[in-house]
Amino acid sequence: MTAEQLLLIAREFCAQHKTTVTNFGALVAAASVSSARIDGIPVHANRQQAAHAMQQILVAYPALNKHNRAFAALSARVFMETESRLSLR
């Protein structure tokens, strides 16, 4: 997931939950961890681990001024659904 994609999710979440993004760096970190590679080798063994890592980052480094656990869970779910659909192609 790109930082831009995660920002789109955040904007929609914020509109529905009357909250705001306060830490754009946290969004970038969470997006980066979802597709992290070292020497071209994925850091995570599978997309479930990548989604969990992204969720952990968003909880540890809150991106919003409130409802961060709910946002982290939603982001991980969207990541899993998106990755699942892409793997079907």
Task: Give each language-model segment a name.
Residues 1-89:
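FIC/Doc superfamily catalytic core
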